[in-house]
């Protein structure tokens, strides 16, 4: 039972990290993270994701100029772009790739690395062009990845009684 509790504690301990140490992430750790991500669930086991590792400083700067909230990329040793094949999973590619993205974030956290999810379907065509992605691959997520140089406090989360409904919306399960 304690293993389950430890896993739940692990889940709630993850934070978005926006400041990183000037220390490279070894390639074997990057590959371990991406190896875990490929086991994320996807509709009909379509696995519509591809991962682009971006280490080039100039390329990270170019992404930073394209995307409004990409400043954490500039201080991170690398970025991982999750590109989704919308043809492989036309009705659920966004959810599928969100699953893979979360697996990346959790695997990185398990290895002591920090991440922050930057991309949210903004400037898709510009990022596709910059990374030479074919039209069918949509950059769903850009993650800054590195060794944390901050320890953010937990942000306020809504109480369960505010978000859990029973049988139909508006019938709060945990009403006070």
What are these regions (language model features)?
Residues 1-176:
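Acidic, surface-exposed loops and disordered segments
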């Amino acid at each position: 039972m304690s293993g389950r509790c430890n896993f739940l504690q692990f889940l709630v301990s993850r934070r978005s990290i926006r400041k990183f140490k000037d220390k490279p992430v070894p390639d074997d750790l990057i590959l371990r993270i991406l190896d875990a991500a490929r086991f994320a669930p996807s509709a009909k086991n379509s696995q519509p994701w591809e991962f682009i590792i971006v280490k080039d400083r100039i390329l990270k700067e170019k992404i930073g100029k394209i995307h409004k909230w990409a400043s954490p990329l500039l201080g991170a040793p690398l970025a991982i772009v999750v590109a989704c094949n919308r043809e492989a999973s036309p009705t659920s590619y966004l959810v599928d790739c969100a699953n893979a993205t979360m697996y990346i974030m959790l695997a990185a956290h398990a290895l002591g690395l920090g991440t922050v999810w930057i991309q949210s379907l903004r400037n898709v065509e510009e990022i596709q062009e910059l990374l030479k992605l074919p039209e069918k691959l949509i950059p769903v997520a850009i993650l800054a990845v590195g060794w944390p140089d901050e320890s953010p406090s937990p942000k306020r989360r809504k109480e369960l009684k505010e978000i859990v409904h029973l049988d139909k919306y508006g019938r709060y399960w945990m009403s006070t």
